[in-house]
Amino acid sequence: MTHVVLIDNHDSFVYNLVDAFAVAGYKCTVFRNTVPVETILAANPDLICLSPGPGYPADAGNMMALIERTLGQIPLLGICLGYQALIEYHGGKVEPCGPVHGTTDNMILTDAGVQSPVFAGLATDVEPDHPEIPGRKVPIGRYHSLGCVVAPDGIESLGTCSSEIGDVIMAARTTDGKAIGLQFHPESVLSPTGPVILSRCVEQLLAN
């Protein structure tokens, strides 16, 4: 059974993620972000999920140190704050983008997002008369006030949403395919296809 270690960044969504991983058939172990990196590695995770949470990534316990130790070695899935940590680790800028809390919005897939197996068949704007033309709108649940507009080196944007500072990246992956980040919340009921997206992220990461 795939063992997912979930890093708890003190967020109310953490146990929604635990439930989502359990429903998908994964074993899930939770560690607070203050737990030493060596303790986390000793749990022998197949994949590490960096959870949502408040504030900025640099203030989230040992999360940045964990990324330093594991990126490229153990598959990483970052959600909301966890995604922002991956952005900052690669030198990207995470900044206030206007609060968006508890709303379903349409993420617009980039060309890379259209081609990604994570979002295959999930777009809602495919025209019945032209099914050969891929859709780009995927409904997702947004709960955030920070975001990134420009993907740093090593990060490829998969989808964006509009914000006060421009189109913020809502889904991304590292160019080596070893990490995926989601600014939105796949574990939220506001993400209609969230469970599918979450499972596909795990599948893609484990396949690389």
Swiss-Prot record:
Domain of life (superkingdom): Bacteria
Reactions listed under catalytic activity: chorismate + L-glutamine = anthranilate + pyruvate + L-glutamate + H(+)
Cellular compartments per GO CC: cytosol
GO MF annotations in UniProt: anthranilate phosphoribosyltransferase activity; anthranilate synthase activity
Keywords: Amino-acid biosynthesis, Aromatic amino acid biosynthesis, Glutamine amidotransferase, Lyase, Tryptophan biosynthesis
CDD domains membership: GATase1_Anthranilate_Synthase (cd01743)
GO BP of this protein: L-tryptophan biosynthetic process; phenazine biosynthetic process
Annotated binding of L-glutamine, by residue: 53-55, 84, 145-146
Pathway recorded for this protein: Amino-acid biosynthesis; L-tryptophan biosynthesis; L-tryptophan from chorismate: step 1/5
Active site (record annotation): 80, 185, 187
Lyase in keyword set: yes
Cross-referenced Gene3D superfamilies: 3.40.50.880
PANTHER family named in the record: BIFUNCTIONAL PROTEIN TRPGD, MULTIFUNCTIONAL TRYPTOPHAN BIOSYNTHESIS PROTEIN-RELATED
Task performed by this protein: Part of a heterotetrameric complex that catalyzes the two-step biosynthesis of anthranilate, an intermediate in the biosynthesis of L-tryptophan. In the first step, the glutamine-binding beta subunit (TrpG) of anthranilate synthase (AS) provides the glutamine amidotransferase activity which generates ammonia as a substrate that, along with chorismate, is used in the second step, catalyzed by the large alpha subunit of AS (TrpE) to produce anthranilate. In the absence of TrpG, TrpE can synthesize anthranilate directly from chorismate and high concentrations of ammonia.
Protein name: Anthranilate synthase component 2
Taxonomic source organism: Corynebacterium glutamicum (strain ATCC 13032 / DSM 20300 / JCM 1318 / BCRC 11384 / CCUG 27702 / LMG 3730 / NBRC 12168 / NCIMB 10025 / NRRL B-2784 / 534)
Gene that encodes it: trpG
